[in-house]
């Protein structure tokens, strides 16, 4: 069995105050895009479940998803081998690990015939804030800590330029830097942002951008590169360090990626993934 694990981009990200449980309230419009990891699940001839992901060492969310699925559903099927082909940059603010975990849950539900929508959501929420929103690729409005989701209509076509960083950034480190810089909004300010939000065409705001740029000074150069390539807006994606450029059409984004690639810049064109895809 095979499944795609689409990356996500935060078209806007408003960060609220730090809660008692050390997590932040947020408001974000999240959009799945065509850039995706590829997963394959099959019976394993080994004694236990195994996840293989070239370039990723140690525990990962997909392995945790497999274990949690068995525990919650009681599935006692044969050992499974899950192979992940990475195409989404790692620790890049694009939800690659969360996308893999969500795709693994979809595969396991198909393979076992078990796992209600509520059970999958429960597992996803326990794995991480970004996982529930990626159980069903498309566009969502995320509130709370990313656990209150509202499905949104697919947007008109537009183009995206993805400019990864040379290394990754820890999401926890970026949020800690945001706290140090005092970037979080108050509860009332977050409510104002939500009230004025146009989910069909959100203003490209990322409250974590200053914090990510503080930890990775190369972000500003990549933002400039995206704008030079014709992007109408350029911003940090999620917790970074990836920069995304927004274009009126997918064709414009492809032209921008080609122009940057000619001068040695790692730039990839993509576009939104429709809910039905």
Model-derived regions, located:
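Short, well-structured alpha-helical segments that form the helix of a local strand-helix-strand
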Residues: 116-127, 223, 254-257
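ATP-binding N-lobe of GHMP and related small-molecule kinases
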Residues: 1-92, 110-114, 155-156, 164-165
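N-terminal pre-core extensions flanking Radical SAM catalytic domains
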Residues: 236-250
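Short, active-site-adjacent cap segments at secondary-structure transitions
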Residues: 89-90, 169-170, 241-244
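DPxDG-like acidic metal-binding loop motif
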Residues: 92-118
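Conserved, helical-rich catalytic subdomain that frames metal- and/or nucleotide-binding sites
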Residues: 49, 136-233, 248-277
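Short, basic/glycine-rich phosphate-binding loops at helix/coil junctions
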Residues: 42-56, 104, 125, 196-205
């Amino acid at each position: 069995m095979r499944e795609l694990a689409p990356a996500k981009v935060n078209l806007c990200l408003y960060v609220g105050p730090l809660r008692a449980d050390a997590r932040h309230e947020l408001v974000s419009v999240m959009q799945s895009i065509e850039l995706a990891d590829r997963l394959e699940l099959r019976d394993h001839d080994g004694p236990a479940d195994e996840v293989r992901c070239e370039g990723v060492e140690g525990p990962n969310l997909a392995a945790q998803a497999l274990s949690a699925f068995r525990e919650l559903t009681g599935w006692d099927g044969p050992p499974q081998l899950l192979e992940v082909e990475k195409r989404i940059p790692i620790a890049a603010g694009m939800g690659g690990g969360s996308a893999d975990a969500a795709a693994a849950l979809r595969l396991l539900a198909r393979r076992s015939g078990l796992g209600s929508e509520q059970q999958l959501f429960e597992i996803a929420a326990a794995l991480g804030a970004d996982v529930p929103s990626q159980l069903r690729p498309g566009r969502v409005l995320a509130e709370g800590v990313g656990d209150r989701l509202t499905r949104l209509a697919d947007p008109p076509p537009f183009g995206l330029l993805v400019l990864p960083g040379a290394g990754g950034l820890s999401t926890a480190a970026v949020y800690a830097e945001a706290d140090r810089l005092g970037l979080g909004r108050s509860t009332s300010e977050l409510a104002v942002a939500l009230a004025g939000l146009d989910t069909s065409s959100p203003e490209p705001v990322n409250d974590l951008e200053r914090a990510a740029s503080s930890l990775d000074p190369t972000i500003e150069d990549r933002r400039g590169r995206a704008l030079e390539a014709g992007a109408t807006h350029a911003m940090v994606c999620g917790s970074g360090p990836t920069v995304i450029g927004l274009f009126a059409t997918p064709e414009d984004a492809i032209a921008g990626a080609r122009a940057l690639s000619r001068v040695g810049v790692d730039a990839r064109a993509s576009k939104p993934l429709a809910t039905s895809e």
